[in-house]
């Protein structure tokens, strides 16, 4: 069973957790997700959260344009991060319907995380692969569609993704 429940970009319960994430832009801001298409998940205890953003490829400057992006994940729960990551990918797949060709990527800033031999180790354990680095030096990790778990809905109330306008309906 999936441990995630669907949330939203300005969930006041998630703000304190988001404020403790290393890439937080403005501490205390009521919104913590990047602009545009996104899926926000939280655990029922609000001790972990996840954001999948899906920026339009034309606005992306990194090499993985078109991919879903895990723009934030913080786990302060007892659950294994690698398990929560796989579940979040499964929920993202259920939410959007099918994965883009580039799959999902995440970026790890090794200057702002604890020094480790394998940056993003929990993502690697979840099935992501090393995909290179950004021009800014962030480690890029990627999960291709063939490696994704089967789609699963989040627990609780479910609101499926609906494009805001026809131009959002993208064919791969």
Language-model segments: which ranges?
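Non-catalytic substrate-recognition and accessory regions of acyl/acetyltransferase enzymes
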Residues: 1-86, 90-107, 112-116, 121-172
């Amino acid at each position: 069973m999936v441990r995630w429940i669907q949330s939203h970009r300005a969930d006041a319960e998630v703000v304190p957790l988001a404020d403790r994430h290393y890439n937080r832009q403005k501490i205390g801001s009521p919104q913590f997700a990047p602009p545009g298409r996104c899926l926000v998940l939280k655990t029922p205890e609000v001790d972990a959260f996840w954001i999948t953003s899906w920026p339009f490829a034309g606005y992306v400057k990194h090499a993985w344009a078109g991919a879903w992006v895990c723009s934030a994940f913080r786990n302060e729960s007892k659950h294994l991060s690698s398990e929560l990551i796989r579940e979040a990918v499964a929920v993202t797949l259920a939410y959007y319907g099918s994965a883009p060709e580039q799959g999902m990527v995440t970026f790890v800033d090794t200057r702002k995380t604890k020094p480790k031999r394998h940056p993003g180790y929990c993502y690697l354990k979840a099935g992501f692969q090393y995909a290179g680095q950004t021009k800014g030096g962030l480690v890029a990790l990627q999960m291709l569609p063939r490696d994704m778990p089967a789609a699963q809905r989040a627990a609780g109330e479910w609101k499926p993704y609906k494009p805001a306008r026809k131009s959002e309906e993208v064919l791969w």
